[in-house]
């Protein structure tokens, strides 16, 4: 299975131009850039450089945050950027609680309505929207869609042009995971993100592990994903303030490739 680099993995060491070059040198065939990195490089130059290296843009990170005040304009720009980069999907980190509110049900309804509002624009642009459920520990601040089941309920309600990004870090614990991956199937599984869950976890956001260093049964989840019809890239996404962000980025990419072959 082909490997893609989510650029968060080396964001503290390299800019986007260096990441694109690094993927080419390490024969990593896919890349999933973050919008701030694209903006820093310039959209046109990023598009040109990615194409010159024959990289597949497996996703653009990110749209979402539908509970924020300025969500609409930013998401419309994100769709446009994803279209220009020919991204296979626009990843949505949907947003946490409405500011000042404790009503998680209301927040989830607002998220559903926001996605419904931008979906016709995304369909017209040919950009699939990928809802990424986040671990419940991030429900308040980042995403109050926390399981594949919740995400797929929205997908089923809204129809075509929308699916899920299955990030093992966020969903490995879910007792319904196998069932919901099967439910998603080839149509809804738009992205598959890999890393590992460390014990102990020292930070709620930035202490992900390299594949093989934690407790996630990656081969098992891979078998479920592939059994459901997914044949796309495996996208490594590691936020690691205390470890991998401090290492030489070429070494990080080398280990990513090695662990993908041996642990996933």
Locations of regions flagged by a protein language model:
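Conserved beta-strand positions in the central sheet of alpha/beta enzyme cores
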Residues: 32, 59-61, 91, 130, ...
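Active-site acidic/histidine proton-transfer and metal-coordination neighborhood
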Residues: 67-163, 173-174, 248
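N-terminal substrate-binding region of glycoside hydrolase catalytic domains
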Residues: 22, 26-41, 59-66
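Catalytic-core regions built around general acid/base machinery
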Residues: 43-53, 114-124, 180, 220, ...
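Glycine-rich, proline-tolerant flexible connector loops at the mouths of alpha/beta enzymes
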Residues: 32-51, 98-103, 138-139
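Active-site-proximal loop/turn and secondary-structure-junction residues that shape catalytic pockets
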Residues: 9-11, 35-39, 63-66, 94-98, ...
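Short hydrophobic interaction/assembly module
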Residues: 49-73
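Histidine-acidic metal/acid-base catalytic patches
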Residues: 1-27, 53, 80-81, 86-88, ...
């Amino acid at each position: 299975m082909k490997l893609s680099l989510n650029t968060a993995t080396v964001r503290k060491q390299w800019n986007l131009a260096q990441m694109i070059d690094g993927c080419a040198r390490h024969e990593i065939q896919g890349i999933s850039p973050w919008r701030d990195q694209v903006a820093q490089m310039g959209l046109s130059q990023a598009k040109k450089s990615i194409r010159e290296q024959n990289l597949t843009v497996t996703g653009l990170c990110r749209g979402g945050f539908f509970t924020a005040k300025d969500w609409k304009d930013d998401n419309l720009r994100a769709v446009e950027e994803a279209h220009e980069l020919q991204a296979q999907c626009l990843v949505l980190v949907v947003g946490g609680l409405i500011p000042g509110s404790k009503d998680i049900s209301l927040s989830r309804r607002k998220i559903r309505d926001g996605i419904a509002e931008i979906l016709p624009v995304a369909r017209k642009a040919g950009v699939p929207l990928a809802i990424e459920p986040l671990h419940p520990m991030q429900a308040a601040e980042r995403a109050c869609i926390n399981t594949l089941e919740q995400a797929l309920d929205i997908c089923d309600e809204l129809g075509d042009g929308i699916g899920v990004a299955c990030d093992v870090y966020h969903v490995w614990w879910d007792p319904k995971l196998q069932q919901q991956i099967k439910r998603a199937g080839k149509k809804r599984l738009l992205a598959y993100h890999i890393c590992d869950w460390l014990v102990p976890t020292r930070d709620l956001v930035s202490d992900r592990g390299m594949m093989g260093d934690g407790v996630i049964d990656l081969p098992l989840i891979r078998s479920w994903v592939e059994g459901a019809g997914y044949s796309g890239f495996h996208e490594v996404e590691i936020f690691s303030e205390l470890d991998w962000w401090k290492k030489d980025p070429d070494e990080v990419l080398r280990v990513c490739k090695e662990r993908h072959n041996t642990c996933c």
